[in-house]
Amino acid sequence: MYGDVDKIGVAIEWHDFRIERSFNWGRTFHPNSLEFCLNLNGHGAVGGVGGTRSDYLPGNCGYYALADGPLPASRRAHDHHQFVTLEFSREHLRNELAQNEADLQPEIRRILFGRKEENVVAPARPMTLQQRSVVASL
């Protein structure tokens, strides 16, 4: 829909697909990024294999941050997947939010301005009515 994380540090992507086999969603994630997912339909999971796991059910949203290494994630077979991802390079967000660092939620502040870059998986939660409205308008 918009942008390119590698070139300008930001991208908004609409995903609408059906799959017959489980899909390795994690291979689409960008290194050193913070990504927000608004999941309208389909089942997905981010994390696991010794770390925190968050399940994306229809109507859920959440975020995950990548360091240099991969982050396991999958999309379930036989589902109709519809979701939006807002993808940002950590560097882009650091530059844009440096003057507002104190206003950020503690976990987001740690992801962007902490001393150690690491993979982070936040718990998915139900989308608000406003978030649903924005996604439905795309």
Label every PLM stretch briefly.
Residues 1-43:
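N-terminal low-complexity or simple alpha-helical regulatory segments
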Residues 43-138:
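Alpha-helical bundle regulatory/interaction domains
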